[in-house]
Amino acid sequence: MANVKLFDQTGKEAGEVVLNDAVFGIEPNESVVFDVIISQRASLRQGTHAVKNRSAVSGGGRKPWRQKGTGRARQGSIRSPQWRGGGIVFGPTPRSYAYKLPRKVRRLALKSVYSEKVAENKFVAVDSLSFTAPKTAEFAKVLAALSIDTKVLVILEEGNEFAALSARNLPNVKVATATTASVLDIVNSDKLLVTQAAISKIEEVLA
């Protein structure tokens, strides 16, 4: 079992947290992490690209000249693909790039990136993040007290609305819950700031 220091939101040590090795202490599987990141990035693509084929281009309903007798090549429409201003052949159409990986693969990737952050001492555990109202300045003080000045992913327990609202407007800060934190978010952050309740939830889901 790995132990990490537990801090309060004033930056003082409040003990230790014992992490479940089945979640936070495995050998990271880089291949699986790569596959999941590619999948998540594909899901973020809009896929709204579109061009007009010959049936979608306006005009071109009349045959431009008669079939025979002009000496020119026969043509049926000025919107045929070989014409300037004509339709595009096999062009891109709106589509979804999303695809799903097996649940076991996604869970292994999450455990891999969590374990990597713990091994690199980039995992900061805090007993709680409680605010009486959404206050961005107050959350900035918490980060300063914990000496966090890089890109950070804040992982909260469900229902901690004030903390989420306090953090989301800060630069280089992204907020997620224990069940919504993605592999892509974790890899893109320099540090993780995780509440004790969120750690328990992560272990419950992934162990």
From Swiss-Prot:
Signal peptide bounds: none
Biological process, per Gene Ontology: translation
Superkingdom of source: Bacteria
Record carries keyword DNA-binding: no
Annotated Gene Ontology cellular component terms: ribonucleoprotein complex; ribosome
GO MF, one annotated term: structural constituent of ribosome
Residue segments, region Disordered: 49-78
Record keywords: Ribonucleoprotein, Ribosomal protein, RNA-binding, rRNA-binding
UniProt keyword annotation of Secreted present: no
SUPFAM superfamilies xref list: Ribosomal protein L4 (SSF52166)
InterPro entries, A to Z: Ribosomal_uL4 (IPR002136), Ribosomal_uL4-like (IPR013005), Ribosomal_uL4_dom_sf (IPR023574)
Family note: Belongs to the universal ribosomal protein uL4 family.
Its job: One of the primary rRNA binding proteins, this protein initially binds near the 5'-end of the 23S rRNA. It is important during the early stages of 50S assembly. It makes multiple contacts with different domains of the 23S rRNA in the assembled 50S subunit and ribosome.
HAMAP family: Ribosomal_uL4_B
Assembly description: Part of the 50S ribosomal subunit.
Protein name as catalogued: Large ribosomal subunit protein uL4
Native organism: Streptococcus sanguinis (strain SK36)
Gene: rplD
